[in-house]
UniProtKB/Swiss-Prot annotation:
Keyword Cytoplasm: no
Domain of life: Bacteria
Cofactor binding note of this UniProt entry: Binds 1 zinc ion per subunit.
Cofactors (names): Zn(2+)
GO biological-process terms attached to the record: glutamyl-tRNA aminoacylation; tRNA modification
EC number(s) reported in the record: 6.1.1.-
Organism listed in the record: Prochlorococcus marinus (strain MIT 9303)
PANTHER family listed in its UniProt record: GLUTAMATE--TRNA LIGASE, GLUTAMYL-Q TRNA(ASP) SYNTHETASE
Motif ('KMSKS' region): 244-248
Function, in words: Catalyzes the tRNA-independent activation of glutamate in presence of ATP and the subsequent transfer of glutamate onto a tRNA(Asp). Glutamate is transferred on the 2-amino-5-(4,5-dihydroxy-2-cyclopenten-1-yl) moiety of the queuosine in the wobble position of the QUC anticodon.
Gene3D superfamilies, sorted: HUPs
GO molecular function, a single term: zinc ion binding
Protein name, per record: Glutamyl-Q tRNA(Asp) synthetase
Amino acid sequence: MATSSELPDHLYEQMEAGQRLRNQGYRGRFAPSPTGPLHLGNLCTALVSWLQARLANGAWLLRVDDLDQPRNRVGAVESLQQDLHWLGLDWDGPVVFQSRRRGLYNSFLSALRRQGKLYACRCSRRMLADISAPAGRHLVYPGTCRDLELFWGWHEGRLPSWRLRVSKEFSHTSGDVILRRADGFIAYHLATVVDELTLGISEVVRGEDLLVAMNAQLALINEISARPVIYRHVPLLCDDQGRKLAKREGHAGLDSLRSEGLGPSHVVGWLAASQSLVPFGAELTAGELLSELKKKEGVLKSVLKP
């Protein structure tokens, strides 16, 4: 495992600054992608994450995960901020944009590569699908490219992706994690972990669909020798066919609800009821919900899954 002292001074200082922030108290975050309007599932996660931070008298940051630029939609950043304001969910400090932190991610990538922690991988998604586990199970990368010659990709005239050699304890839960994609984009796990550590995030509250990402992120944190982040997961909202709500499926956002005449207290009440925080039919603002939960110790934590 790499030690923090092996990181370049400027990265070590960023890690130390993040740790100091964590030591000061609870710090949570909400990290949507600007790929379209937030649907009710996104907003439910935002509400629960905000409540968890405010119940702890902590900070709640808004981070925009906009690295995958071809998928970003014009106006989505402004829209998601307006939706959060409309629901009464306030954040602390300026909005953090991942697209403005590429240099930091690449510095961590270079440091890990110099330490011999990475290797080039030529596996495509199709190749991995051919060796994947049965449908519905998470694929653990089998290490196909671990022992390939380092520069195979350039010899073949194409760029590789770069994977992290995880320690034995994570080999059966995450496998070797992609940190940079073959198209040159920094991978989700690297950007997310670097942000959690350098922004001082102490606990991540996110949708249950991201539970599969936890082991990969813990494996990377382990290699950087940082104190693990606490992960909590919110049960997913599903449509009447049992499918999780998704932007690509066109599931309802706030615009359609507002057009029906529903106000913030209706939506907050419904979202809270969907997590058994209040009875269905309750109408209350985010601030009123927070006040109610302060009287009911442990109710919110009972909703969250590790």
